Amino acid sequence: MHHNPLLVGLLAALPLASGAIITGSHVPLTGYNLSWTIDDTAATIEVTVAAQTTGWVAFGIASSGGMYGADIMMATVDDSTGAASVNDYHAFSQVAPIMDEQQDWTLVSGSQADGWTTVTATRALVTGDLQDWALSATSSWTLLAAMGPSDSTTAMHAASSRTSYRVNLFRPQDGLISLIDTQVRTVPSVQSLDFQA
């Protein structure tokens, strides 16, 4: 059997096989567990955040190491009723994020138990919303992970360590690609990681 080397090379270069399901997980911040599933057929990403807080949790992506230009998913679980909610935000600087005009994250589930908030939400890889980043296997991004002390999404997150490193969401088996930056910050603080999505 003869193989066409050009065809073999092209197939090897494809970032995602048609119909592929990719799953991964990471602990970017102490008390903050992130997992994700990318469904190529549905062209969606499902994100689960489990954080040691009874306040808000957030997951975001940005083109740089900070909040400027960030595309953010913020979620809460009401302490009294247990009702969960998720909202789509964007940020221009180190101030409170602004809610998007178009809401592209859909809540799958949310719960609180033993001081932990767990929220799962999904969105299209490409939403068509100018306030969202389009996710693809060939793009590089910074991942933002944060949590707050209360359900008020205007409540600032506490001071903590900040770490930046590269992770490819479409190739989670590669693990940590490179450590970029570690420093202690004061409020506002955010844990950030560069990844290719």
Regions found by a protein language model. Give the residues of each.
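Classical eukaryotic N-terminal signal peptides for Sec-dependent ER targeting/secretion
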Residues: 1-11
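Extracellular-facing/secreted segment signature in eukaryotic proteins
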Residues: 9, 15-197
